[in-house]
Amino acid sequence: MPEDYTSLVTAMKALTQASAVTSEPDKVLKVAEDGWDTRPDADSYGEIYLEFETGSLDGDNRKKNRAFEGSVHLFSRKRDGEGWPALIEQTLTEYCDSCWRLDYHTHETETNLFHWEWVYQVEG
């Protein structure tokens, strides 16, 4: 996995740990337990939830110097995402110099969660 994407994930996790000290537990950003490729269960993740996914564009994660596609998913019960979408956007811009945005979209899920997705190509 490209170093920039690794540092981005580290930054996101640090950001979420910092949020855990809030006195309002419903606004704490939860991170997927393993950090990758999981989907939230609406009843078990509180108000807000973050996940990361990554993989090489050609499907072979073993080779070095590959272009990777990475994505960050944010789920929230509130339409404004408690301000997290803007903070995540800022973190993506700040920590991932080699990230090229492929897609960004939002929608409401079948479990009444609001979903933001940032998809990037990351040069290896």
What are these regions (language model features)?
Residues D43-E89, T93, D97-D103:
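Short, conserved turn/kink motifs that form compact alpha/beta structural patches or helix kinks used as
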Residues M1-D58, D80, W84:
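Small/polar-rich, solvent-exposed N-terminal microdomains that initiate assembly or binding
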Residues D34, E82, S98, F114-W116:
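Short, low-complexity intrinsically disordered segments
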Residues M1-A11, F52-A67, W100-G124:
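Short, charged interaction patches at domain edges and termini
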Residues L29, T93, T109-T111:
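Intrinsically disordered, low-complexity regions enriched in Ser/Pro/Gly/Gln/His and often acidic
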